[in-house]
């Protein structure tokens, strides 16, 4: 009888610990699932802005434009 009570107490203690940890991890997951898409979009926007800025700099730089034009003319000459 003594061991049975000890096992029952251990079972309930284990159940409470698992239940609390599940609730804690569930709340962390719900917070993370709300924040993660925002963080991903933030990095995508930064990358998109960098690409747009680079594209704008390429268009404004006459030397870069000449290099592209030379490359296209070489391709046409080879065809």
From Swiss-Prot:
UniProt keyword Secreted present: yes
GO BP, sorted A to Z: cytolysis in another organism; defense response to Gram-negative bacterium; defense response to Gram-positive bacterium; killing of cells of another organism
Recorded superkingdom: Eukaryota
Tissue expression from the record: Expressed by the venom gland.
GO MF annotation list: toxin activity
Keyword Cell wall biogenesis/degradation: no
GO CC terms of this entry: extracellular region; membrane; other organism cell membrane
Function: Antimicrobial peptide that may act by disrupting the integrity of the bacterial cell membrane. Has antibacterial activity against Gram-negative bacterium E.coli NBRC 3972 (MIC=10 uM) and against Gram-positive bacteria S.aureus NBRC 13276 (MIC=2.5-5 uM) and B.subtilis NBRC 3009 (MIC=0.5-1 uM). Also shows potent activity against antibiotic-sensitive and -resistant Acinetobacter baumannii (MIC=1.8-3.6 uM). Shows cytolytic activity against human and sheep erythrocytes. Toxic to cricket A.domestica.
Entry domain remark: Amphipathic and cationic peptide with an alpha-helical structure.
Additional detail: Fragments comprising residues 10-25, 1-19, 7-25, 1-22, 4-25 and 1-23 have been detected in venom but it is unclear whether they have a physiological role or are simply due to degradation.
Protein family per UniProt: Belongs to the non-disulfide-bridged peptide (NDBP) superfamily. Medium-length antimicrobial peptide (group 3) family.
Protein name: Peptide Im-5
Lineage: Eukaryota, Metazoa, Ecdysozoa, Arthropoda, Chelicerata
């Amino acid at each position: 009888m003594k061991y049975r009570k000890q096992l029952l107490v251990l079972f309930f203690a284990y159940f409470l610990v698992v239940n609390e940890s599940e609730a804690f991890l569930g709340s962390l997951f719900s917070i993370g699932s709300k924040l993660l898409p925002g963080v991903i979009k933030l990095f995508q926007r930064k990358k998109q802005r960098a690409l747009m800025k680079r594209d704008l700099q390429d268009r404004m730089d006459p030397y870069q434009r000449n290099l592209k034009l030379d490359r296209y003319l070489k391709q046409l000459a080879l065809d």
